[in-house]
A protein has these predicted regions:
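Short, charged interaction patches at domain edges and termini
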Residues: 1-18, 79-83, 128-192
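A broad, low-specificity signal marking well-ordered, structured residues that form hydrophobic/aromatic
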Residues: 57-59, 88, 166-168
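Extracellular/virion structural assembly segments
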Residues: 77-125
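Short N-terminal helix-initiation segments at or just after the protein's N-terminus
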Residues: 18-38, 107-115, 167-178
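Surface-exposed beta-strand edges and their flanking turn/coil or helix-capping segments
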Residues: 74, 103-105, 181-185
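Small/polar-rich, solvent-exposed N-terminal microdomains that initiate assembly or binding
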Residues: 1-76, 131
């Protein structure tokens, strides 16, 4: 479910033209006393996210626990309806080369990105087989110190003033019945 949402959102992010390298869902890892964001590379290992000096990149990560609650179903009293809330964070690093005014570039860019990814959720609803799917921005930061302290710990973070750093918080809310979750229990597994 979440991978389909991230793929859909990344297509919309790519269309903005701001970001060269749009990564999928990352995790904050702790290794040897250091905390940093990393992407799973499908070889049973995580690769640290390295900011591209020449371009720009973004990645998504869950910013908290997913909550699921049962809700009253106003359209069908006998079917169970669920409300799933996924807190997401979009973190990015974008070159300012085309900015006319670097003082307002970061805020304008965040507002543009929010406008692009939070519109037309009908496609997302259809992909998820959900009754309703909404992505709502809950806030953003363009303060590189705050972003660095949220994403890294015990790592010397070297700021690049040629780039804008941003972090946007979202809540993904999905209203669905059990069809939205089908397929997750069908994955092969072994007990042993």
């Amino acid at each position: 479910m979440l991978s389909e949402v991230i793929i859909y959102l990344n297509v919309k992010l790519t269309d903005t033209g701001y970001i060269n390298d749009v990564l999928c869902l990352a995790e904050k890892l702790e290794r040897e006393g250091k905390v940093y964001p990393a992407i799973y590379n499908s070889k049973n290992e995580y690769v640290p996210i390295n900011f591209d000096l020449n371009g720009s990149l973004s990645y998504w990560r869950k910013s908290g626990d997913v909550s699921i609650s049962e809700e009253e179903n106003p359209t069908s009293g006998y079917l169970v309806q669920y409300k799933t809330t996924v807190p997401l964070k979009l973190v990015g690093f974008i070159r300012k080369e085309n900015a006319h005014n670097t003082a307002t570039f970061s805020d304008n860019m965040c507002q543009n990105i929010i406008g692009v990814v939070t519109t037309n959720t009908a496609v997302m609803k259809q992909v998820l087989k959900a009754k309703r799917a909404t992505l709502t921005a809950t806030g953003y930061s363009t303060d590189w110190r705050k972003i660095a302290s949220d994403e890294y710990d015990n790592i010397d973070f070297e700021v690049r003033y040629t780039h804008s750093y941003f972090s946007i918080d979202f809540n993904l809310v999905i209203i669905s019945n059990a069809n939205c979750y089908q397929g997750f229990c069908d994955l092969p597994y072994t007990i042993g």
